[in-house]
Amino acid sequence: MDYDFKVKLSSERERVEDLFEYEGCKVGRGTYGHVYKAKRKDGKDDKDYALKQIEGTGISMSACREIALLRELKHPNVISLLKVFLSHADRKVWLLFDYAEHDLWHIIKFHRASKANKKPVQLPRGMVKSLLYQILDGIHYLHANWVLHRDLKPANILVMGEGPERGRVKIADMGFARLFNSPLKPLADLDPVVVTFWYRAPELLLGARHYTKAIDIWAIGCIFAELLTSEPIFHCRQEDIKTSNPYHHDQLDRIFNVMGFPADKDWEDIKKMPEHSTLMKDFRRNTYTNCSLIKYMEKHKVKPDSKAFHLLQKLLTMDPIKRITSEQAMQDPYFLEDPLPTSDVFAGCQIPYPKREFLTEEEPDEKGDKKTQQQQQGNNHTNGTGHPGNQDSGHAQGPPLKKVRVVPPTTTSGGLIMTSDYQRSNPHAAYPNPGPSTSQPQSSMGYSATSQQPPQYSHQTHRY
């Protein structure tokens, strides 16, 4: 390239430090890099933005995948990539996003902490329904455009704070997303270990080579159960497995302890799973005779004859072929009964959740991790399984994930899916304050999480 042209191009390239004020406003940190809450220096608007600085120099395959997809995908419930900055001096990459003040990881944590403080505050029924509907709407859009998210978990479900998009769900962290319209090889051959353990579908744990959109639906079912109970439904001891083998005994054991062991008639193709022989060697069906989703949810006061439970059953169907689709789920009777889903998940009432706090440069995001994990494992008494400690966000609470190549997606013949219209309900009374909860720096928008958790559960770190 001509030297003079390079100099001219460099002088004209916009620099993130010239456009945005973000010093001292770090809200997330992890192996992927750093995330800052930022404002425009020129004062053209008063909006908050999220600046994600990618760790290292150049662009990783994961970052390339995320950028390629986000440049093509446009939907109210999928996070918007506004701009990409390339720093010529230090070869750093910056991604500019809309700023979301909340995420489901912190929202659920808030309600779990209220239970621990003996002042339980349940997530309002209408809020749970609105959250689920918008998650399904965003995933339906991705699936209609041939994209699997593959890493759905509460940390990657953002919720906008005060502003024009108040209470709007944003699905974030497309770093593990993949196109599935015409893969050159089965997806499992490229990277068999995907999705955070607790939200991983049973067919993944059994080594399925041709997994489908159903893996995202299972993860949504896990999130739905967590919204209803304030506890992760399939929490399990987390091991740092240095292998690409997707089989995970303890995670399967936890699923069977909740759901029961699948009958042959309920999942006929289970015998075709690569790890079926290992499954039959490690497990005995009669061990889980008294286990069922009905019994588990009844313990959390979710009635088996409720429409919410019926939808949960369809989302958490063991057989991926029989599992409901996002489009079918959005048409479920659950969403037709009062309270109806709203575009503002807070339904116009006061937002009780604290805003994110800034991290200091010296303050580690994983502060107190080991101590917390040891305490939790010491107190463990759930079906013989422990609880995972925080993993760095690059590993997303599971074995290392292989990076794979991806190209920008093509839209379906009808173009991009349009957003759904939401019915708006009248504002409800403000949420009661559950009293003091754990105080810690807030992580943000799929960014790296802090480690001090309410009792029982150390959760995954998260990224934008």
From Swiss-Prot:
GO biological process: negative regulation of triglyceride metabolic process; positive regulation of transcription by RNA polymerase II; protein ubiquitination
Broad enzyme group: transferase
Protein localization: Nucleus
Catalytic activity annotation: L-seryl-[protein] + ATP = O-phospho-L-seryl-[protein] + ADP + H(+); L-threonyl-[protein] + ATP = O-phospho-L-threonyl-[protein] + ADP + H(+); [DNA-directed RNA polymerase] + ATP = phospho-[DNA-directed RNA polymerase] + ADP + H(+)
Family, per entry: Belongs to the protein kinase superfamily. CMGC Ser/Thr protein kinase family. CDC2/CDKX subfamily.
Role this protein plays: Component of the Mediator complex, a coactivator involved in regulated gene transcription of nearly all RNA polymerase II-dependent genes. Mediator functions as a bridge to convey information from gene-specific regulatory proteins to the basal RNA polymerase II transcription machinery. Mediator is recruited to promoters by direct interactions with regulatory proteins and serves as a scaffold for the assembly of a functional pre-initiation complex with RNA polymerase II and the general transcription factors.
Designated name of the protein: Cyclin-dependent kinase 8
UniProt lineage: Eukaryota, Metazoa, Chordata, Craniata, Vertebrata
